[in-house]
Amino acid sequence: MEEIIKIYDNKIGISFHWKDRGINLIQLIFCDTGFHLTENEIETFLEKVIDSKNQKNCATCVKGENCKSILLQTPSEKVSMAVSQIELAQIDDLLKGTLFQIKMNNYLVNLCKN
């Protein structure tokens, strides 16, 4: 893991920068899937997560919060993911935590320049 700079992680995944590839793209990995996204794309993804929270499970579903009945749109128009309510909450945390750390790091870098 020496080739990366970790930004944030939780139970479902991790976000990081590759050391040798600059910091414009952020690698997000969760649900066995990797995304290379800009900060704006992560914000868009977070909006899609919030929209997906309005989807409900079937009333008769025996799996409850573990049922992968929520269709999560990704920043790529051609890719959607089936996730559970639990996974959706963890993805929400991963995206929010990543954005918080990026914004905090940018703030500190700008503060130290002055």
Question: Residue locations for each model-derived region?
Answer:
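Positively charged, low-complexity terminal tracts
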Residues: 1-114
